[in-house]
Amino acid sequence: MPRTPADRLLTETVTAGPAWSVVLLLLDVGRSAAALALPALLASAVDAQTTGGDPGTVGRLAGLVAVLILLDIASLLVSPWHVNTLVLGLRRDLLGHVLRLGVRQRAVFSTGDLTTRLLTNTGEVASVVPLAAGWIGSLLMSGGALVALALIDWRLCVAFAAGAPIVTLIIRFFVGRASPLMTDYMTVQGSIAGRLTEVLTGLRSVRAAGAERREIDRVLADLPELHRAGRASWLLQGRLNLHASLVLPLIQVAVVATAGYTLLAGSLTPGQFTAATAYAGMAFGLFNQANAFMALAQARAGARRLAEVLTTGATTPGSRELPAGPGELAFRGVRGPGRYADLTIPGGAMVAVVGESGAGKSTLLMLAGRLLDPDEGEVLLDGVPLREVSERALAGAVSWAFERPAYLPGTIADAIGFGSGERVREAAELARADTFVRRLPAGYDTPCADAPLSGGERQRLGLARALARPARLLLLDDAVSSVDSVTELHISRALAAHPATRLVATHRASLAARADLVVWLDGAGVRAVAPHADLLGQDDYRGLFGAEREPIHV
């Protein structure tokens, strides 16, 4: 029974795609069987030449060599294809689990670290299948070679068995220390990749601050630790190869010397001596795999890193459908992160969420859209707890726009229509994006990668994407912070006419003034829920917006 999540993952990988795993195993077993038959036929051919035996033995020997070549070719074709299929499945499982992680669970792993796990560690884990098949083939070959040695002369088997326990202890000693070193190496590598991703994301800020050297030093701060772990693993592998290369030839010499003695004594024919020499080398095949054992240790280390992510609790979707409703949002006894107990957002209302930076505006929206689950209490949409709503129903009911919207590869139309494919141009017009999109070289068919967009234009496309979906709950997380005042006026008018419940996290007094209600947050949770005009009499509230003037309604 597998003892750890990593061992379970390796076992599941071996048993995934069982048909092709069996084919790969049969190819390795077939190669081992053919290899075992080769010395016997070679012995017959040698004896036939020296004693005038069956001349057809040479032809059978040539046929067996041809079979071995064909089996090798088939294995070289099947193994990479099957491994790549397993890698694809592991990457799909890992990426799917990451996408289901809550915000807090996801924050544990940096983007660069997850990229390393996704691109590198999955390949290392998938390699366990050909490793296992090859090891089983080697085991059968070694066992068959030992039986063949015993059948030729029992003393040959005794000579081999005298040194086998020593080799076993050497391999077990070194491999047991290799896996932790591999894990350390991969962990440090992931940490470096994470910091590199952060720097590349903020590259303009780094250059503007003249901080290139400082950031390079920060990214590579763990390089000595990476060097230490890598050097230790390579030294360990070198020592394993050294010890094996010292012990194995001595045992093989003992077997060959015993065979030579029995040949001189007349107990063996020249052909049997030739076969015994070949079988002695085959019997060591199981032990003479230092690189394979180190690869297995690397696969286990990769499995630990994948299992670390896969065993992190993901958001579990419910199974209920949402009833027809206006999009009323209710917080009941919600605690941690933030305190939003007994807060109700009326269906169809436009509600501004304001507060100082760090007060919990984004957290409130994440709870409302179930990107985050509360530690206590429930968040309900039209009377149904979000924990119980199915993934499909929730995706259809909630639409998002973010401060820094991300676009998938594709065209501008694809970016706006992502998730729905409907109302693309109408949504772009509502978000005041249609005009600048039409100026692009190919309009809505312009690839996102070829569209030089400002921060405000990107935000308008993100808002258009949110408006393109017929959702009952629209969540805008500082989604118009980079647009100019005139554009913001038109957007706020479009939002005011939208039938969905709109929850808008903002730092702008103009948006708060146009909302039906304002939810004012401080570090402890909800401080007040009231119209903007009712809150303006409080100095702390006015201070949230600095010197921004009240909007002129036109």
Walk through the language-model features, giving the residues of each:
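Helix-to-loop junction immediately C-terminal to a conserved catalytic motif
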Residues: 369
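Transmembrane helix-loop-helix hairpins at lipid-water interfaces of multipass membrane proteins
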Residues: 15-71, 150-155, 270
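An intracellular "coupling" helix at the cytosolic face of ABC transporter transmembrane type-1 domains
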Residues: 11-19, 103, 120-129, 180-181, ...
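Transmembrane helices of ABC transporter permease
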Residues: 24-30, 37, 44, 133-184, ...
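C-terminal portion of ABC ATPase nucleotide-binding domains
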Residues: 508, 513-554
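Cytosolic ends of transmembrane helices, especially the final helix of ABC transmembrane type-1 domains
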Residues: 211, 283-311
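Hydrophobic alpha-helical segments in the permease module
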Residues: 60-72, 164-166, 240-252, 270-294
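Membrane-integrated ABC transporters
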Residues: 1-36, 54-57, 79, 139, ...
